[in-house]
Amino acid sequence: MHSSPSAGKQRVALVMQYLGTHFHGWQRQPNFSSIQEEVELAIAKVVGQPVTLHGAGRTDAGVHAAAQVAHFDDPVGQIPPHRWSKILNGHLPQDIIVRGSAAVDSHWHARFSALWRRYRYSIYTDQWPNLFADQFSWHYYRFPLQEKTIQAAMEPLLGKHHLAAFHRAGSARRHSWVEVQGVECYRRGPMVYLEIQANGFLYGMVRLLVGMLAEVGSGQRSLTDFNDIWVNQRRDLVKYAAPAKGLCLLRVGYENFPLPDSLWFDSQPLWQFTG
C-alpha cells in the first residue's frame, strides 16, 4: 500500500494536533485564520510552491483535535516522508503540531479512505470555575448531569439513521444518513465525557446532539422527547449547540494506517481535573 521514498511526487500523511481556540476552523477561507491554511503555508515554505492539504475532518471554529489526519502531495519528493513532522513543526504556530508523518500510496486519501471518526465532548460540572478546564470544556453546573441517563439516550442512535435533527444549516451535504458505530458517556470526577464514533458526521452534529443530551441528562427533557425529536427529524425543536471549545476530534480510523497506534489518544481523556 505504501510507496517507498523516491525523487519525484510523493504523497505524505500527517497526524496532527491543534488547539482550535484561535482558528476559524479547519477549512481555508478568505479573511480568517484556519488550520488548513497555516499548515499549507508551512509546507509551501519548504517546497517553494503552493500545495493543497486534505483533512479527514473539517472541524468547526474553536474545535480542537487530538489526532487529525491529513495528506498532501510533496511535488519534489526529496524529503524522506518520516521527516516532514519535525520539519513542519519548525514552521508552525505553537498551537498546531505534527506528531508523525509517513509515505502513503497515491490513491490513499485522508478523508475518503477513512473508515470512521471519533469525537469526544468534555463537560465540566463543578460549580467552581476552573481556568484550565474552561479552555477545553463546557462549564455546565446549574443542573446535575446523570451520565447513565445520557448513555441510555445515546444507545438508540447506534446503527444507520437519518439524523437531520442534528444537522446545522449551511452544509452542502445532500443527505442526513449517518452510521453511528459507538457511543459512550462516562464521568471522571467533575468531568463528564461523551464520545461518539461514526462513519461520518453532519455539519454541527455533535454539538447539537450534546446540547440536547445535556437537557436529557439534567432532567429538563425526557428520554421519550429526545427519541421523538431525532426519529421524526424535528430540527425545529433542537434549540442550541454546545460550545465549540468542549469538542475534540479524537481519532480517525483507517485500514493499514502506516503510523503507530501510540499517536492516538483513544483510551483516556486528554485533560482530567479534580475540581
Swiss-Prot record:
Top-level taxon in the UniProt lineage: Bacteria
Lineage: Bacteria, Bacillati, Cyanobacteriota, Cyanophyceae, Synechococcales
InterPro entries in the record: PsdUridine_synth_cat_dom_sf, PsdUridine_synth_TruA, PsdUridine_synth_TruA_a/b_dom, PsdUridine_synth_TruA_C, TruA/RsuA/RluB/E/F_N
Annotated protein name in UniProt: tRNA pseudouridine synthase A
BP GO terms, sorted: tRNA pseudouridine synthesis
GO molecular function: pseudouridine synthase activity; RNA binding; tRNA pseudouridine(38-40) synthase activity
Gene: truA
UniProt-annotated catalytic positions: 60
Broad class of enzyme this protein falls into: isomerase
Catalysed reaction, written as an equation: uridine(38/39/40) in tRNA = pseudouridine(38/39/40) in tRNA
Natural source organism: Synechocystis sp. (strain ATCC 27184 / PCC 6803 / Kazusa)
